């Protein structure tokens, strides 16, 4: 079978049309609504306690102390971030939280605990919650985990709907399968990237204007890096949905299979690791195993994660295209 080379002008035209069509389609609107609700809800849940702490400070001392607020965020966020990054286990985080609970004063144990915490403050955690705006870092970590579950609402129906109603036969009179396949993938990626930009910009603007605990330039710079991490991460998951959508005839089945594939890999790896430790490596079947590295301080790590995203994208995209070229429409 001959895999045909896409025509750049056709791919560009189809991608621009598809990205605009996504905004008018039911799938695009559902994705936009779910993504906005999820992203802004995460931000609200994390920012609200900070606002309450600021209000409490204002009542008690007549003003807010940004330095004290930032320190409180770091103290609370450190074990959580270390758990999310896989640096510490849940048991270790629980023990540290218990050690911080009020109790009888013990200078020896307190000093030992302080030394232990300082020694365990790894460079990655230090980068995320000390060198960068900690609140925004935690929001980004949650979005990196949650957005792959949301992206399938946008990307599930790139091809399958037109296969079901045989609409592609009319399009193929004017263009090639390769142009349709890659154009729709690119259009979906463009729409997803725009939505990520809206979410990150809204959260950053609100955090900066409402709390004023971080310098504006620090927030803006970290927001750009977080946006790039989210935008890059969505691309391989969109490619997975492209593969599934090109392989089945039903949009509903495509959505179900996309959900099962994305969530199933994570679930099987986590549950399987309790019985057999090597099961955790199943996470690397999808970007789950390394996606947090997109926020790593070392260039080798975040660049490696970005290149891995492109490699996963190329693999799933070409697998889907091979299937799409061979199948009967």
Which ranges hold each PLM region?
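Helix-loop-helix units of permease transmembrane domains in multi-pass membrane transporters
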Residues: 158-190
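Alpha-helical transmembrane segments of multipass membrane proteins
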Residues: 18, 201-205, 239-243, 263, ...
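Secretory targeting signals
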Residues: 41-71, 106, 110-157, 181-252, ...
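Hydrophobic alpha-helical membrane-insertion segments
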Residues: 31-47, 188-198, 257-273
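Transmembrane helix-loop junction
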Residues: 21, 161, 173, 204, ...
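Aromatic- and glycine-rich beta-strand/loop motifs that create alpha-glucan
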Residues: 1-35
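Hydrophobic core positions of alpha-helical segments in small-molecule transporters
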Residues: 31-34, 182-183, 254-257, 308, ...
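Terminal transmembrane helical anchor/hairpin motif
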Residues: 8, 45-78, 82-134, 257-329
């Amino acid at each position: 079978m001959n895999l045909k080379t896409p025509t750049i002008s056709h791919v560009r035209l189809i991608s621009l049309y598809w990205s605009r069509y996504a905004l008018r389609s039911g799938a695009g609107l559902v994705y936009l609504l779910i993504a906005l609700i999820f992203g802004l809800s995460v931000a609200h849940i994390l920012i609200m306690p900070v606002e309450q702490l600021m209000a409490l400070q204002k009542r008690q001392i007549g003003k807010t102390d940004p330095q004290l607020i930032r320190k409180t965020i770091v103290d609370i966020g450190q074990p959580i971030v270390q758990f999310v990054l896989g640096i510490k286990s849940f048991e270790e985080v629980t023990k540290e939280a218990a050690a911080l609970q009020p109790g009888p004063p013990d200078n020896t144990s307190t000093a030992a605990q302080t030394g232990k915490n300082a020694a365990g403050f790894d460079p990655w955690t230090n980068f995320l919650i000390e060198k960068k705006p900690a609140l925004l870092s935690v929001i980004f970590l949650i979005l990196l985990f949650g957005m792959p579950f949301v992206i399938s609402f946008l990307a599930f129906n790139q091809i399958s709907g037109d296969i079901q109603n045989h609409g592609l036969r009319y399009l193929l009179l004017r263009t090639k399968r390769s142009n349709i396949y890659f154009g729709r993938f690119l259009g979906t990626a463009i729409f997803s990237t725009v939505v990520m930009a809206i979410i990150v910009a809204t959260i950053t603007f609100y955090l900066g204007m409402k709390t004023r605990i971080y310098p504006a330039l620090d927030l803006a710079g970290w927001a750009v890096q977080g946006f790039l991490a989210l935008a890059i991460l969505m691309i391989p998951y969109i490619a997975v949905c492209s593969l599934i959508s090109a392989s089945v005839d039903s949009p509903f089945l495509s959505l179900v299979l996309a959900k099962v594939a994305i969530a199933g890999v994570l679930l099987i790896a986590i549950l399987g690791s309790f019985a057999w430790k090597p099961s955790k490596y199943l996470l690397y079947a999808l970007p789950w195993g390394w996606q947090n590295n997109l926020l790593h301080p070392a260039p080798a790590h975040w660049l490696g994660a970005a290149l891995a995203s492109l490699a996963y994208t190329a693999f799933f995209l070409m697998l889907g295209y091979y299937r799409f070229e061979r199948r009967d429409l």
